[in-house]
């Protein structure tokens, strides 16, 4: 009896010890997965949807990679074999690094979208000044607004005009706001993406006509407009420079 009972109990004890060790080794990655899933559940919208998909994939792969303890067999030798298998060293460092990287990318993307979602005029002005060809910057006020849309229903919450060195045609006006988009361009800020899209559609009605509005693109809840005096490639390049400055994380 003893010759069979003792080894069997020892095997069970080995098995349980191995399972405890494994559970201990799994704690860090399981906590990381739980914390990350909590962040995903908050449903914060990123600028690049792919960053969220990549993060979800990383979590899914991490879950699959976790070593699980198998159900204990009844045979003594099999239990010993199981214990050895479960106790083998486990290394999740690559998996954890992958989650960390994907989480950082997603959180940065969320911050980037926030920067172009109804930003303050001071933020826009600060970033515009960092674009190499932009010379002067001035925001519209309710008393001095060529379109008369500032803070009105469906109107913009900020409108920042700028002059650009690539515009060589003379543009008349007492100041940058007065000269309007023609001197370089303008950033119009809206509360919602819908309002920005509506404004963009309205501006599109004048494309190619007598009142050529220049280029206009929606990013987040803002419309980036550039002067009709610029060539198409200059408009595109200037728009990209401005956009990249606005989403740059500091």
Question: In which residue ranges do the predicted regions lie?
Answer:
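N-terminal "mature-domain start" segment
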Residues: 24-27, 31-34, 38, 53, ...
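Amphipathic alpha-helical assembly segments used for oligomerization, scaffolding, or translocation
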Residues: 1-118
């Amino acid at each position: 009896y003893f010759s069979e009972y003792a080894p069997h109990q020892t095997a069970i004890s080995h098995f349980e010890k191995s399972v405890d060790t494994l559970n201990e080794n799994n704690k860090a990655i399981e906590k990381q997965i739980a914390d990350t899933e909590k962040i995903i559940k908050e449903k914060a919208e990123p600028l690049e949807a792919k960053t969220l998909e990549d993060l979800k994939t990383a979590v899914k792969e991490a879950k699959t990679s976790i070593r699980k303890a198998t159900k204990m067999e009844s045979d003594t030798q099999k239990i010993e074999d199981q214990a050895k298998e479960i106790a083998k060293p486990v290394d999740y460092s690559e998996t954890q690094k992958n989650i960390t990287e994907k989480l950082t990318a997603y959180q940065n993307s969320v911050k980037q979208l926030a920067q172009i979602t109804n930003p303050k005029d001071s933020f826009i002005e600060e970033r515009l000044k960092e674009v190499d060809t932009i010379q002067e910057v001035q925001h519209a006020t309710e008393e001095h607004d060529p379109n008369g849309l500032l803070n009105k229903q469906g109107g913009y919450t900020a409108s920042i005009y700028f002059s650009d060195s690539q515009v060589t045609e003379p543009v008349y006006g007492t100041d940058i706001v007065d000269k309007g988009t023609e001197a370089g361009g303008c950033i119009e800020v809206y509360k919602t993406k819908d309002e920005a899209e509506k404004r963009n559609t309205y501006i599109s009605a004048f494309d190619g006509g007598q009142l050529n509005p220049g280029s206009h693109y929606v990013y987040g809840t803002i419309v980036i407009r550039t002067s009709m005096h610029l060539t198409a490639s200059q408009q595109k390049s200037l728009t990209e420079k401005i956009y990249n400055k606005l989403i740059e994380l500091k």
